[in-house]
């Protein structure tokens, strides 16, 4: 069974919910108050692709504060995918994504990097200030995946990473496999399908592995 590392970088303004998206994907948890990321940290989670191949996501959480922006460029090296996150209630976060983050990725990332846009905090739709159609059109311009997400309710979180895995692996169907606590992840062969399965290890393996960067 082969294992391939797959580097994903999340970028966007401070406070848009990058850390919360990762925490929800890795641990299925949400915290109202999270300290802003300084520098960058990464977490890991594996997906199982067709034929039993394992894609090990290395998910990098980067700082959105202006004073750390110059550091972000180094995280794009060898990245397979970049997710630009904006807050649907903050028009400024969308404009910065268009005018700054998209250009930073273009100038510093590998040519064939997979792009995705996460329209986060969809649970606050009544406070939305960003037109979704405009955001979707921008995603089309970049040939980027577009997913509306809520780190609080978990809406769209798995879909975001599923779509990235599909685009990379060529899979056409997605099955999320939730493991019972303490159960070891298993690879199940499925004939005549292209499937990516999100693996959810037991509690002893469930906490994200993080490395600090200063």
Where are these regions (language model features)?
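WD40-repeat beta-propellers
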Residues: 58-60, 93, 100
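Post-Walker A alpha-helix
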Residues: 22-23
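Conserved beta-strand segments of the P-loop GTPase G domain that flank and frequently precede/overlap
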Residues: 59-60, 83-87, 117-120, 149
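Conserved alpha-helical scaffold flanking the Walker A/P-loop in AAA+ ATPase domains
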Residues: 43, 69-74, 105
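Conserved Switch II/interswitch segment of TRAFAC-class P-loop GTPases
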Residues: 79-98, 109-112, 122-129
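Conserved P-loop small GTPase signature centered on TRAFAC-class small GTPases
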Residues: 1-15, 19, 49-54, 111-214
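Switch II (G3) loop of P-loop NTPases
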Residues: 54-68
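Switch I (effector-binding) loop of TRAFAC-class P-loop GTPase G-domains
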Residues: 27-54
